[in-house]
Regions:
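Compositionally biased, low-complexity segments enriched in small residues
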Residues: 3-4, 99, 112, 319
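Extracytoplasmic soluble-region selector
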Residues: 290-338
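Conserved G/P- and acidic residue-centered "switch" motifs that form tight phosphate/ATP-binding loops
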Residues: 205
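Gram-positive cell-envelope targeting signals
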Residues: 1-24
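Cys-dependent protein tyrosine phosphatase-like superfamily
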Residues: 16-199, 211-291
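Conserved SAM/SAH-binding loop-helix junction
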Residues: 208
């Protein structure tokens, strides 16, 4: 009880502190989970249903949007799982989807899923207070909406009110999911009952949602072409994991493309055993962290050439870092004197 009270006090302090008191690098605010303050009244964004694969995906939903979505999901299966891919705290104020927003949408980094969910539960203490929620532009608050909190609901509570299951895969935004979270998902997915339906979502319904939809399709199609799977996901609304070396991509975006292909290699090697070796163990034995000089060559099937040459042009958007897949090994490269 003492821990719960402490969490409640800290959460309230964060939510109610005037925005101008935050240092820019530590700024956290309540975000309405779409760019339009009235989006929660409209159609849910980035919805796609993949019938053959038994899954669907979307952006974050409001209470009203979830009611419509739940009706569709129940037509697909009696065994529906809502797979919440967000690390940042979120929930519903008066039915409106809101979340913590920090720099690079990075609120809650370092916290466990249990800690995050405990904070979300504790926010029922907001009832009766008035808060201001904002849309976000470049991770800064915009277009405030003042809300007198009459109702606070966690996503787990909302999901279970419709008779559905809830799974939290707490992943930070803008990067490939942590290895331990992928382990948890694969261990969950491999034991699903036949006919189960998974609905994935994150904030926008693209990056984190797409990563797990991609992994789930890979588990179902270990003999397919990885490029076909990645293209299928890109065509249906997931983040683009196809183009690995486009110069406009950030290091994190390029790394996601590489690690998606590495996960497919892992699945091909381990699905027949029922994934006795988990992803994080496999990656540990199939990865190398090295330092290279500009112009140095890495023999093997390279990221963009054969052999791989670490060059100014290759690393121009990666700030002296690269992640590449060479044969069956992932190389995490730091470029010296960049």
């Amino acid at each position: 009880m003492r821990t719960l009270k402490r969490i409640t006090a800290l959460a309230l302090a964060v939510l109610l502190l005037p925005l101008h008191l935050y240092a820019a690098e530590d700024s956290v605010f309540i975000r309405i989970d779409r760019d339009d303050p009235d989006a929660w009244k409209k159609e849910l964004a980035n919805v796609r249903f993949l019938e053959e694969e038994g899954m669907s995906g979307s952006a974050q939903f409001s209470e009203t949007q979830f009611g419509d979505l739940a009706a569709e999901l129940k037509e697909e299966s009696e065994d529906v799982w809502i797979v919440d891919c967000r690390l940042e705290s979120h929930g519903l104020i008066n039915g409106i989807a809101v979340s913590w927003c920090g720099e690079d949408n990075g609120a809650n980094l370092g916290k466990t899923p249990e800690e995050v969910e405990a904070e979300e539960e504790a926010l029922s203490s907001l009832i009766g207070t008035t808060v201001t929620a904002y849309t976000a532009e470049n991770d800064r608050p915009k277009d405030g909406l003042e809300l007198t909190v009459e109702k606070w609901e966690t996503e787990r509570t909302l999901t279970e009110s419709e008779g559905m299951h809830y799974l939290r895969l707490a992943c930070p935004d803008h990067c490939w999911p942590p290895s331990e979270v992928i382990d948890s998902f694969i261990n969950f997915a491999k034991d699903l009952e036949e006919g189960a339906w998974l609905h994935f979502h994150c904030q926008a319904g693209s990056g984190r949602t797409g990563a797990f939809m991609t992994i789930y399709e890979m588990m179902q199609k270990p003999d397919a072409s990885v490029e076909d799977i990645l293209q299928h996901q890109a065509d249906t609304g997931s983040g683009n994991l196809v183009e690995r070396s486009a110069p406009e991509k950030s290091h994190a975006q390029k790394e996601r493309c590489v690690l998606a292909r590495a996960v497919f290699q892992y699945i091909q090697a381990n699905y027949e055993s029922g994934y006795e070796v988990n992803w994080s163990e496999w990656l540990e034995t199939h990865s190398r962290t090295i330092t290279m000089q500009i112009g140095e060559k890495l023999d093997g099937e390279g990221f963009s050439s054969d052999p791989l040459v670490v060059s100014d042009s290759l690393e121009a958007s990666a700030a002296g870092r690269a992640t590449v897949l060479v044969d069956n090994d992932v190389y995490f490269i730091t470029v010296e004197n960049y």
